């Protein structure tokens, strides 16, 4: 398939997919909150899109202005509600360590995503800010106007966050995998999630996100052999974007 695919060709492929032995069961598109409108939503729905990833980055308007993001938190809330009303799964991209942030304010910001019912996405991806050359942030770094956290500060903050996430959310990614030689400042650990999980286990902490509770990850990462005797049904009821959500899981 190419970007030049016509509507007729797309419809044909969608019909073929319905009877294929190995079917595509989901389609994800990434965009910005301020690009979400009825026309865009109808086009994405026609393409068969099931999930939208939103570049939220932060829920503090002062920081969004400082980094010249081009949208505010009102746009985030509006887009989130609109997408949910049209039946899409919503995945937020969150970026701790942005200019103007501290580990404490980042923790507060990310917890607000679940404390405030106008947010509450289905999934999140956490991308700690890193600095590469030929960027405005690199110029800030050289002038001493921006400084990243230490690895220890970042790990400690993310441990506190993971220990408090609700059961209905999936943390589907914890870093953006950028080659280390390109990174001028910021996290370079490609296994950051594993480092955090190992420390949490030693400290008796647990992440209840959907990914961490999946049987496959329990078996391969936590070496759990059998969960049959521990299986329980959970129904999480919560308010989100003016509606009531029920998340059912085991």
Placement of each model-derived feature along the sequence:
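Intrinsic disorder/low-complexity segments
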Residues: 2-5, 219-228
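Intrinsically disordered low-complexity regions specifically enriched for long asparagine
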Residues: 93, 124, 171, 227-229
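Low-complexity, compositionally biased segments
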Residues: 33, 37, 180, 220-222
